Amino acid sequence: MTARIGVVTFPGSLDDRDTQRAIRVAGAEPVALWHKDKDLKQVDAVVLCGGFSYGDYLRAGAIARFSPVMDTVIDQAKAGLPVLGICNGFQILTEAHLLPGGMLGNDHLHFICRDQKLRVENADTSWTSDYTAGQEIHIPLKNMDGRYVADRRTLDELEAEGRVAFRYLDMNPNGSLNDIAGITNAAGNVVGLMPHPEHAVESLIGTGRTDGLPFFTSILKKLVNA
């Protein structure tokens, strides 16, 4: 039976179709979920994609966190449902307190769009198991509010528990503390990151790299072997 991965679309989402395409390339079935849906249609995992949900009013992800679909996502994530938040999706996960910390505007106050070098720090999550710890990858990055922040106690816990999933290499593009590009929850089923793996899954388009594909093959293998 084909694994079914839901992709949530909020008003202002930009990368839902790209994410659905990445899921197909990996061999799973994408399932479109609307922000007003309360039923997740029996999906096996959920992706919150990038964009500017609700125009980023109040704060990036702050309004989307209260969409009807998020009530169900939060409940099921706490029960073990794999959830991936990409860019705006990462912001939403922090607003929903499924991941600690928060996101602020880039320290240089400019929108950035670049291919970003990352190091995989944790390859033991639902979404990263097809990588190896220490692996260096290149993933497209595009954001205005990508600066990850947290208090010192939270940062120390993330580092001590191995919950930093990805770290920026060569340069810190937005001022994120500890060069953090992505993190995971303690259980490893919820992962959020600012770069866009869905834009790096096919060699014929974009950068020509497929460094983002393991996100989607990782979750597929986990679901198939569950």
From Swiss-Prot:
Subcellular location field: Cytoplasm
Protein name: Phosphoribosylformylglycinamidine synthase subunit PurQ
Provenance organism: Streptomyces coelicolor (strain ATCC BAA-471 / A3(2) / M145)
Ranges of residues in domain Glutamine amidotransferase type-1: 4-226
This enzyme's EC code(s): 6.3.5.3, 3.5.1.2
Catalytic activity reported: N(2)-formyl-N(1)-(5-phospho-beta-D-ribosyl)glycinamide + L-glutamine + ATP + H2O = 2-formamido-N(1)-(5-O-phospho-beta-D-ribosyl)acetamidine + L-glutamate + ADP + phosphate + H(+); L-glutamine + H2O = L-glutamate + NH4(+)
Keywords (A to Z) from UniProt: ATP-binding, Cytoplasm, Glutamine amidotransferase, Hydrolase, Ligase, Nucleotide-binding, Purine biosynthesis
Keyword Cytoplasm attributed: yes
Keyword Transit peptide: no
Disulfide-bond pairs as recorded: none
GO molecular function: ATP binding; glutaminase activity; phosphoribosylformylglycinamidine synthase activity
Origin superkingdom: Bacteria
GO CC field: cytoplasm
